[in-house]
From Swiss-Prot:
Required for the post-translational delivery of tail-anchored (TA) proteins to the endoplasmic reticulum. Together with GET1, acts as a membrane receptor for soluble GET3, which recognizes and selectively binds the transmembrane domain of TA proteins in the cytosol. The GET complex cooperates with the HDEL receptor ERD2 to mediate the ATP-dependent retrieval of resident ER proteins that contain a C-terminal H-D-E-L retention signal from the Golgi to the ER. Residues 42-55 have a biased composition (Low complexity). One of its GO terms (biological process) is protein insertion into ER membrane. PANTHER family: GOLGI TO ER TRAFFIC PROTEIN 2. HAMAP family: Get2 (MF_03114). InterPro entries: GET2, Get2/sif1. It is a multi-pass membrane protein. Residues 186-211, 297-298 are lumenal. This is Golgi to ER traffic protein 2. Residues 40-92 are annotated as: Disordered. The chain crosses the membrane at residues 165-185, 212-231, 276-296. It is found in: Endoplasmic reticulum membrane; Golgi apparatus membrane.
Length: 298
């Protein structure tokens, strides 16, 4: 169907421009935009180039639709936790032990930690871990796992050695006390307990209990002196007191009252001598039980 013939004389200038624009758009829509563009560009040139392509002839890219299903995410990306971001300028710590040791190292480098509760807590943990020996500079600054393992094994060995020597002394004390008691009981017919003071003050020929207590006191002095000498030479005398409830309570209280740190060595020494007194009281309790059984038998 041909377009109707329009008298151009009767058309105004605006209508002429509109008709020309519509004709150009109709030609462009038929795929001739590239040819027309090349004709315009090649005017005045002896060689025609067809390397230019109009944007009207280019295929439009498909617009992504928001109604489409999203891409399925890999399940491993959900189950695998993201890696922990290390601090700036530092490597990522391997485990909680290294973090704790790093905190101890920073606490050991501080000059004045008396008013810092966190520093006092770190110091208390370090003292409990290290036993009776004070933490040296090399011990607090080391980050070598082999060194930390050695310190842990040394602490376990000292604890085992301490229990072993206590058990040995317990066997010796009980054996000596029983031997002293049964020796007098078997060899002396009048060996028995008495409630009267004048009987206990008699000589060993008339009342052999006095001779028994003389030997008992002598052996106790020898055993206590040997116990102190051996434990002090092995470095175990004060180590047994570091895990006592009193020193732990003082370490906790020193976070509030730092003055308690000055009294801890005195309390530790008192607990050590109290342990020696406990040896004598324990052996004396055994003697009381033996004389009680002897009185019940007679």
């Amino acid at each position: 169907m041909s377009e109707p013939v329009v008298d151009t004389a009767e058309l105004s200038a605006e209508e002429k421009k509109r008709l020309l624009r519509e004709r150009r758009q109709a030609k462009m829509s038929k795929g001739k935009a590239t040819a027309r563009l090349n004709d315009i560009l090649s005017q005045g040139s002896s060689v025609k180039t067809s390397g230019v392509k109009s944007v009207l002839d280019q295929e439009k890219e498909a617009t992504p639709s928001h109604d489409e299903d999203p891409e399925i995410q890999d399940i491993t990306e959900i189950t695998t936790p993201p890696p922990r971001t290390p601090p700036i300028g530092e490597d990522a710590p391997q485990d909680i032990d290294k973090i704790f040791q790093s905190m101890l190292q920073q606490q050991g480098q501080g000059a004045d930690t008396a008013g810092d509760p966190f520093a006092q807590i770190m110091k208390m943990f370090n003292q409990v871990e290290g036993g009776d020996s004070p933490p040296s500079e090399s011990a607090t600054s080391t980050q070598d796992p082999a060194e930390l393992k050695y310190r842990q094994e040394l602490l376990e060995y000292n604890t085992y050695n301490q229990k072993l020597w206590k058990f040995r002394f317990l066997l010796v004390r009980v054996s000596v006390t029983l031997f002293n008691f049964f020796y007098h009981y078997i060899n002396l017919s009048n060996f028995h307990a008495s409630n009267y003071a004048y009987v206990r003050d008699l000589s060993s020929e008339k009342y052999p209990v006095r001779d028994f207590f003389t030997w008992f006191a002598t052996t106790e002095v020898v055993l206590v002196a040997a116990y102190y000498s051996i434990f002090h030479s092995l470095g175990l005398f004060h180590a047994a007191n570091q895990n006592s409830f009193v020193l732990k309570a003082m370490s906790m209280g020193s976070m509030v009252l730092p003055q308690l740190e000055h009294y801890k060595p005195l309390v530790a020494r008192f607990l050590g001598y109290y342990e020696l007194l406990g040896i004598v009281l324990g052996d004396l309790s055994l003697v009381i039980v033996l004389f009680g059984l002897l009185s019940f038998a007679n």
